[in-house]
Amino acid sequence: MPIITLPDGTKKEFSGSITIADIASDIGPGLASAAIAGKVNQDLVDISIPIDYDAEIKIITAKDKEGVEIIRHSFAHLIGHAVKQLYPDAKMAIGPIIEDGFYYDISYSKTFTPEDLARIEERIKDLIKLNYDVVVEIVSRDKALNTFKDRNEPYKVEIINNIPEGETIKLYKHQEYIDMCRGPHVPNTKHLNSFKLMRVSGAYWRGDSDNEMLQRIYGTAWANKKDLKAYINRLEEAEKRDHRKIGKKMDLFHTQEEAPGMVFWHPNGWSIYQVLEKYIRDVLNNNYYQEVKTPQAVDRSLWEKSGHWDKFKDDMFTTTSENREYAIKPMNCPCHIQIFNQGLKSYRDLPIRLAEFGSCHRNEPSGALHGLMRVRNFVQDDAHIFCTEAQVQSEVSNFIDLVFEVYKSFGFNEIIIKLSTRPKKRVGSEFIWDKSEKALSEALNSKGLDWSYLPGEGAFYGPKIEFSLKDCLNRVWQCGTIQVDFSMPSRLEAKYIDEKGEKKEPVMLHRAILGSFERFIGILIENYAGNFPVWLAPVQIIVMGITDRNSSCCESLTTKLINKGYRVKLDLRNEKIGFKIREHTLNRIPYLLIIGDKEEKEGKIAVRTREGNDMGSISLEEFLVILNKSISLKGRFD
């Protein structure tokens, strides 16, 4: 007789085998109607799976995060059901969930059009209205194989052929349509009501460009229509904030086919880049980092010694000269060890913090490239700290402070922290991993920070802390990281002399705050919608005259401001002042300075902001107080 323990600690004893559906019904009709799956001893199961043993149970509904994911997965199967009804010759591949949605990869002789997408969506709605039961059946591998052979589904057959013999497989039956999945799925289509098909794109089978190009139908699904509407609104706002559109409108940068994944920075965009670089350089200097510069191309032998060649050679750009093969560096760490290795180091010299604005190249797939967010050439705010084991925790603790200081300067106050622990494939002893993970966790705990584990997601050479920003649309961007590395110093023979006069390998901490300048600027463009804080704005001030008579005074003011180090432009076009104000407001310039006969006579300037605030006529000295305060705040809006 199974004894079931509920989340509140209540225990219920049942006379025989039961299901999640039975337990939900025993608790009450409301829960029975809302239940879509269950969690049995932390494992998600369908509500119809029998339980004949003692277990801790949680009923999953659409209010749970897992419930929404199950709903999305079930919608992927509904795509399959609808497509097979409308296009019987289509062959179904895979249909997993992704962030905020799901997709299904399909092989079909004709290209799906927007009209086809609308037709599929309508058929899904018709199927939902039928309120049919989704039936799960656990079958042998051979039965599953024969099922999909009979249904002429070659991709399903290929998947099953890669499953070991003797394994069982779950089949999910949507009336006449059958799919396979680990599950769980909703028990009835009545739980599926808030969705939208988003788009169709191409995708290679198994992500391999040597395989067939399939058609991928993307969709999103939510627990209710309110959440769906909120998501669509966020997408529309994100579309307006697309850094590629704003970048073009503000003349910040462009990319082109002749240099895929490489950024052409325009003067306005390069201005932002330079301000960002100067700020980070000042922060590093204030925290006792030493800036270095290492070569772009390094002989293959160094990458083989470091271990990067075996793991990343397909992602490297290479070149040959005089019968030697070089890799354009994809990261900076092996080169920083070469600098550390020049000259004998003592424990008294540690920690040594080497920083570089390192230009790196990685051969990302062309289909993955996306404006500034995913590029092939990028600059990291990279640094490596060489320290003793005893110094690891304090160095990590100091870096955490640094990360929060920098992010706050851009207005990011909500930081998500995760500690990635040892993966299955790793180097180093369990003792070293225990010590490394403990040092990172204690550094986080000493700050009183909320954080969570990412089990098994550490690098092969050591655990890491990841810092992610949440932007104004509640999107999460992983940017900063600090990683403990006991492996590379050993591989590349880094040594220092310890207190006993013996040679010892330093611990190496890999760390970055922004991640890459390109991606971080892309994040800033979208977060600010191009309305950069004054300290970052490409043009901080525009000076305009009302008539030609005011040109000389405008030129003099512009020169004064430029000489004081501000970024200023002069507009003496023969246009109406209202037209110029509107144009420069749309161009997101923070301060608009206007000089007419009255201002010139009184020795004042009329000041307007891009938000439309008319600050009246004030002296230059008064304006500079306002301007300097705005700049000093950086992006700290709190």
UniProtKB/Swiss-Prot annotation:
Keywords: Aminoacyl-tRNA synthetase, ATP-binding, Cytoplasm, Ligase, Metal-binding, Nucleotide-binding, Protein biosynthesis, RNA-binding, tRNA-binding, Zinc. It is an enzyme of class 6 (ligase). Its EC number is 6.1.1.3. It is found in: Cytoplasm. GO terms for biological process: threonyl-tRNA aminoacylation. Its main location: cytoplasm. Its cofactor is Zn(2+). Residues 1-61 form the TGS domain. Zn(2+) binds at residues 333, 384, 510. Binds 1 zinc ion per subunit. One of its GO terms (molecular function) is threonine-tRNA ligase activity. Residues 242-533 are annotated as: Catalytic. GO terms for cellular component: cytosol. It comes from the Bacteria. Transmembrane segments: none annotated. Homodimer. Catalyzes the attachment of threonine to tRNA(Thr) in a two-step reaction: L-threonine is first activated by ATP to form Thr-AMP and then transferred to the acceptor end of tRNA(Thr). Also edits incorrectly charged L-seryl-tRNA(Thr). Belongs to the class-II aminoacyl-tRNA synthetase family. This is Threonine--tRNA ligase. It comes from Prochlorococcus marinus (strain MIT 9211). The gene is thrS.
